[in-house]
Amino acid sequence: MPKQLSPDQDKLHKNILRDRFLSSFKQPGRFRAELEKVKLILKRKGHE
């Protein structure tokens, strides 16, 4: 995977994360799992 995303890809990625985040509020059981997944992704990005 390329390390640098184009602005459009980055925006799309953020939108996907936001949509997942919002939809997870409707399913509280999945919410924590999604949150942990997002935290891991962000942590990984920070270390690259």
From Swiss-Prot:
Organism: Salmonella phage P22 (Bacteriophage P22)
InterPro entries the UniProt entry points to: DUF2740 (IPR022626)
The protein, known as: Uncharacterized 5.8 kDa protein
